[in-house]
Amino acid sequence: MEVGDELTDLPEKICDMYAKIDHAPVYTDFKNANAVGVVGAKKALYAMFKNIVIDVSVRHYYGDVRLFLLVDDEKQYEWVRMLPHLGNDKGTRNIVCNNESKNNLFENLFRELNYREQTKNIPYYCVVLVENEFGIKNHPISRYIENAAELGMTFVFFETSAEKLPLHCDEIITLLSEQQGNICHSENGNRVQDFEYQAISDMQAGAVVQMLAPVYCEEIGLENSLRKNITLFELLHIFAAEDLDLGKRWSESQIYKTMAAPLGVN
């Protein structure tokens, strides 16, 4: 006679219950992607552009991730200018909106990619958002797109049709509307995942940028604790040259017992 055990059916019930989870987060892996393509109507592309900029900015320290923007309407993107993630070492913003700014940023970007390729040094991660390509596909920068992830960089191209996307896009995001879309992996075209997203207004995005703009984090390191230089008077504990009794120091010094080398200050 067999005795039924309710626990034997429990694993199958749990599996069926959680086989599909509603409202689970869907993400694109920027860190391991050389390039990501976003396809859709202009309005939907702009909505996704804002979502990506805000999401990356609020989740990552501006010293770890830097953004580069290639846009065609400077006034439309006025809200993003004060974002600290757009700053660079020259004190300017990584925004391309005309030919003059294009030449400067492309030169800096090409130099950075070349430096990383040769030294394998990646001081911070870069996300390049291309809303208007400004000829980047024909620039020497384009030869780095294929292996951009290895150089700590990801390119995100926003186009109205998939045919306009460059090669080497590891993932393609198709925006079906301003609330829905799907993401497809280039390695497996059958691997398509649907998702829903919420668009934010320029005012909301600008408010987030205004909160992030004044944030400053002082980096902790040895440079802040060690002095870069020290005067000879401080080292000898004197205030004037007259305080230095050379005769006494010479007679008391026993340099033959050691070979001292100055390392620092106690």
Q: Model regions: which residues?
A:
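Accessory regions of macromolecular translocation/handling assemblies
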Residues: M1-N266
